[in-house]
Amino acid sequence: MFSGIIQELGEVCFFEAQGNGLSLGIKSTPLFVTPLVTGDSVAVDGVCLTLTSCNESKIFFDVIPETLACTTLGEKRCSDQVNLEAALKMGDSIGGHLLSGHVFGTAEIFLIKENRYYFRGSKELSQYLFEKGFIAIDGISLTLVSVDSDTFSVGLIPETLQRTTLGKKREGERVNIEIDMSTKIQVDTVKRILASSGKD
């Protein structure tokens, strides 16, 4: 599990196709990398990946085709920056909201207006979004400001823009989206109840 509070930025330093998947290497600070060991979970732009190897400043992962199909990781290239968060340990504080690192899909930035970012996603995504509700964008825990049929927006404080990759994003770029799991469970449960009663 993760908290949605980005601990460090990383830079893609290795990117190589492996069958239908890929091998991904990321360079970061020794402060972030040193505590990690092979087998640890790390959220890379919000995607939970398992560490396959590491050294003093680099961490490596294998990314399977299913992950590439529903995230932006396959679009990364060497020198691209990514958000990093190590998995929570017992007793760690949760500064954002609980995340699994299982990305629901992607959304496109279609408008940036000062500190307000507007995104376009699928209608399937929108059914789980509510104003003032939680959302994770590239692994960052954020609060939804507005929600329409297939668009939504968030407001970003200067600290978030400075410490994450969102401050460098441009209109037209895609981001990874994880919806709040408790909200998804409630919505899906209500839909099943309505469907079984013939009221859907």
UniProtKB/Swiss-Prot annotation:
Catalytic activity annotation: 2 6,7-dimethyl-8-(1-D-ribityl)lumazine + H(+) = 5-amino-6-(D-ribitylamino)uracil + riboflavin
Superkingdom classification of source: Bacteria
Signal peptide limits: none
InterPro entries: ATP_synth_asu-like_sf (IPR023366), Lumazine-bd (IPR001783), Lumazine-bd_dom (IPR026017), Riboflavin_synthase-like_b-brl (IPR017938)
Associated pathway: Cofactor biosynthesis; riboflavin biosynthesis; riboflavin from 2-hydroxy-3-oxobutyl phosphate and 5-amino-6-(D-ribitylamino)uracil: step 2/2
Residue stretches of each Lumazine-binding repeat: 1-97, 98-190
Coiled coil: none
Sorted UniProt keywords: Repeat, Riboflavin biosynthesis, Transferase
Residues reported to bind 2,4-dihydroxypteridine 1: G4, I5, I6, S141, L142, T143, G155, L156, I157, P158, E159, T160
Gene Ontology MF annotations: riboflavin synthase activity
Disulfide partners: none
Binding positions for 2,4-dihydroxypteridine 2 per the UniProt entry: C48, L49, T50, D62, V63, I64, P65, E66, T67, G101, H102, V103, K132
EC numbers on record: 2.5.1.9
GO biological process assignments: riboflavin biosynthetic process
Keyword Lyase: no
UniProt enzyme class: transferase
Function (record text): Catalyzes the dismutation of two molecules of 6,7-dimethyl-8-ribityllumazine, resulting in the formation of riboflavin and 5-amino-6-(D-ribitylamino)uracil.
Subunit (UniProt): Homotrimer.
NCBIfam families xref list: PRK09289.1 (NF006767), PRK13020.1 (NF009566), ribE (TIGR00187)
The name this protein goes by in its record: Riboflavin synthase
Classification of source organism: Bacteria, Pseudomonadati, Chlamydiota, Chlamydiia, Chlamydiales
